């Protein structure tokens, strides 16, 4: 079985910018590249799980999301780092348009994408972690017995006051990695 770190994307890996899809707007959070490289070196599967409601709302396409993920991989490769997989939900139950207006099991806080990744990568949840800047990023991890960390980047500073579960708090993705390695 494999150990993994499940990462939210916006506000955790990259600076939070509403409905980010343009490559020119992408910016890693401080220490994110180094953190991902350390996770790779320590044999963690690095798996991104992200809600992409901008697709559901018609702001951008799934192809734009895929293009941005390819760009992220290209940037990480320059530092001998990589993300093992990107999973994202393009749906929204209220604000979705057309086929994307859907109450699904993949949109966080539901755990459908976590369950799929756990199966796809044969993940040992007891040796795994989740990191995000919103409680809704971490609820599916907690539901699957994955140790969870709320980062103070993105929406983390606003979300911290609502913590009621056994989540830990850390400055950013890099500080999380230094705590577990």
From Swiss-Prot:
Its cofactor is Mg(2+); Zn(2+). InterPro entries: HAD-like_sf (IPR036412), HAD-SF_hydro_IIIA (IPR006549), HAD_sf (IPR023214), Heptose_bisP_phosphatase (IPR004446), Histidinol-phos (IPR006543), PNK3P (IPR013954). Disulfide bonds: none annotated. Substrate binds at residues 8-10, 16-19, 50-53, 107-108, 134. Pathway: Nucleotide-sugar biosynthesis; GDP-D-glycero-alpha-D-manno-heptose biosynthesis; GDP-D-glycero-alpha-D-manno-heptose from D-glycero-alpha-D-manno-heptose 7-phosphate: step 2/3. It is found in: Cytoplasm. Gene3D superfamilies: HAD superfamily/HAD-like (3.40.50.1000). The record marks 50, 108 as: Stabilizes the phosphoryl group. The record marks 107 as: Contributes to substrate recognition. It holds the Pfam family PNK3P. Zn(2+) binds at residues 89, 91, 104, 106. Its main location: cytoplasm. Is probably involved in the capsular polysaccharide (CPS) biosynthesis. Monomer. This is D-glycero-alpha-D-manno-heptose-1,7-bisphosphate 7-phosphatase. It comes from Clostridium acetobutylicum (strain ATCC 824 / DSM 792 / JCM 1419 / IAM 19013 / LMG 5710 / NBRC 13948 / NRRL B-527 / VKM B-1787 / 2291 / W).
């Amino acid at each position: 079985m494999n150990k993994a770190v499940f990462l939210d994307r916006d506000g955790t890996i990259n600076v939070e910018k509403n409905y980010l899809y343009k490559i020119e707007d992408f910016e890693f959070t401080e220490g994110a590249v180094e953190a991902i490289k350390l996770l790779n070196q320590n044999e963690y599967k690095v798996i991104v799980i992200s809600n992409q409601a901008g697709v559901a709302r018609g702001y951008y396409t799934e192809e734009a999301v895929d293009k941005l993920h390819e760009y992220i991989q290209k940037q990480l490769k320059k530092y001998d780092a990589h993300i093992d997989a990107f999973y994202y939900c393009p749906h929204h139950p209220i604000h979705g348009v057309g086929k994307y207006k859907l109450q699904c099991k993949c949109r966080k806080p539901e755990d459908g994408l976590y369950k799929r990744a756990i199966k796809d990568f044969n993940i040992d949840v007891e040796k795994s972690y989740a990191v995000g800047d919103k409680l809704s990023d971490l609820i599916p991890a907690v539901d699957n017995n994955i140790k969870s960390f709320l980062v103070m980047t993105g929406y983390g500073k606003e979300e911290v006051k609502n913590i009621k579960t056994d989540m830990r708090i850390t400055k950013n993705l890099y500080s999380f990695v230094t705590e577990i390695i």
